[in-house]
Regions:
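N-terminal domain-onset segments
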Residues: 1-65
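Solvent-exposed loop and beta-edge segments used for protein-protein assembly and interaction
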Residues: 30-32, 71, 87-89
Length: 171
């Protein structure tokens, strides 16, 4: 689309793309994609699934998790969805996210097709979808919270995944 792609903060862009790649991998392995959030807290990445009976319930669970994530610097909320295009409705894995205190968040995604055998073909490049709600709009920057204000689950030491340099604890 002709929509102008904004400058997305680098950390946020990395988290959004990480979430999309995680989702893509799950789907290629034939697993169901349960909506999940990834949160960056002090160099660590926390992944939490948000299974629900409806997309609305998943959304509310994700929003609740992120709004309570004091000390986090960015998040992504990733789910399987669709977008309306000039060529009709397209399947897309969507990651939307934001950073503390910003009015708006951003949504990016991988468009994909499914063949008759159930095999997925994903677009090479993530596409910018548009602005999204920012669940972190009311949070302060991560460094503005003292250790005592940050949920303990985000302060534990975690194992770093050497291949990405991104911590993968909290799956």
């Amino acid at each position: 689309s002709s929509e102008e792609v904004p400058e997305i903060p680098e950390m946020l862009e990395n988290v959004l793309l990480f979430a999309l790649d995680e989702a893509k991998e799950k789907m290629e392995e034939g697993a169901e994609l349960v909506p999940f959030t990834t949160l960056v807290v002090k160099e660590n990445l926390f992944i939490e699934s948000h299974p629900g009976d409806s997309s609305e319930e998943c959304y509310n669970l994700a929003q609740h998790t992120v709004e309570g994530a004091r000390g986090a610097d960015a998040y992504a909320f990733c789910y399987d969805g669709y977008v309306e295009t000039d060529d009709g409705t397209k399947d897309v894995i969507i990651a939307e996210g934001g950073v503390p205190g910003a009015k708006d968040g951003y949504a990016v995604g991988y468009l994909y097709t499914v063949d008759d055998e159930g095999g997925y073909t994903f677009e090479e490049e993530a596409a910018y979808i548009g602005e999204a709600p920012n669940f972190m709009a009311k949070l302060k920057s991560g460094v503005d919270y003292g250790e005592d204000e940050i949920d303990e689950k985000y302060l534990t030491e975690v194992d770093e995944d050497p291949s990405t340099g991104i911590d993968t604890d909290g799956e």
